[in-house]
Design a protein with these regions (language model features):
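Subset of outer-membrane beta-barrel
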Residues: 1-267
Length: 267
């Protein structure tokens, strides 16, 4: 099984903005070590993991415009080899009163744009790439085990430009409905579109119960994604504080189905 853990936190500093951090960990589990000689396995096991740690700053300049940026450290490990990189995310959000039934900017059309993973290249290095080499195996009198190293290739991070639009066709004291659509332009795949809908049912004295659904990777040449669905519960307490519990289901094609669980606290 593949397990992913995401942990994040943020704090609002008056007059400064929002400061946040996040850690994403991916564990691909244990796998058998194989070689050309022992293709069924040597009896050893190895693990592969990924880690991304981010530091984020964002600020609302005016009531209708906000921006943010994240500095990320990314590291990938396979057995005794690892690769690392630094990357930057940049984004802006514009709230307009277009299609706003209340006349408020936050209830109108929201337009967002972002650039993700603008950073350095990655390259695997480690003791697994060290191998003894006989540079002249058919000649006598030379060193038979010269220290050598396989030089792995470099690769770029998946740079993604994204633009999205969201509207609220229904805004009331008991229910909000939001429809969103994103267009993606990555450097390592074809362009695609994500779309989704969220129905928030407001329960007086309790909180909010949300139902969500969407479609991912529309118009991608070879999509490996399908339908997404989920729900969320927000329980309010002590005025403006809340506990949030969310569940999401995602179809990932050849990798099967993914189930995601989130617990959050706002105070």
């Amino acid at each position: 099984d593949i397990n992913m853990l995401f942990t994040a936190g943020a704090i609002v500093i008056p007059g400064v903005g929002n400061i946040g951090f996040g850690i994403t960990q991916m564990d691909y589990g244990e796998m058998d070590v194989t070689t050309l000689e022992y293709q069924e396995g040597t009896g050893e096991k190895f693990k592969a993991t990924d880690l991304a740690a981010s530091f984020t700053y964002s600020r609302k300049i005016v009531s209708w415009f906000a921006f943010g940026s994240s500095l990320k450290f990314i590291r990938s490990n396979i057995w005794h080899s690892s690769a690392s990189a630094f990357a930057l995310d940049l984004g802006v959000l514009v709230n307009t009163n277009f299609f706003s039934f209340t006349g408020k900017d936050q209830d109108g059309m929201n337009i967002g744009m972002s650039i993700s993973n603008y950073g350095t290249r990655m390259q695997f290095n480690g003791i697994d790439s060290y191998q003894p080499i006989d540079i002249s195996e058919y000649e006598e009198g030379n060193y038979g085990d010269v220290a050598g190293q396989f030089r792995t290739g470099e690769w770029e991070l998946p740079l993604i430009f994204r633009i999205g639009v969201a509207i609220k066709p229904i805004v009331s004291n008991f229910m909000d409905v939001k429809i969103a659509i994103d267009a993606l332009h990555p450097n390592n795949n074809s362009e695609s579109i994500n779309t989704g809908i969220s129905v928030d049912n407001k329960i007086p004295g309790f909180g909010v119960f949300s139902l969500r659904g969407g479609l991912k990777a529309l118009f991608m040449d070879t999509p490996q994604y399908g339908t997404t669905a989920g729900f969320g519960i927000q329980v309010n307490y002590l005025g403006n504080q809340s506990i949030n519990v969310d569940y999401a289901y995602k179809d990932i094609g050849i990798l099967g189905n993914m189930h995601a669980y989130t617990v959050g606290i706002s105070f």
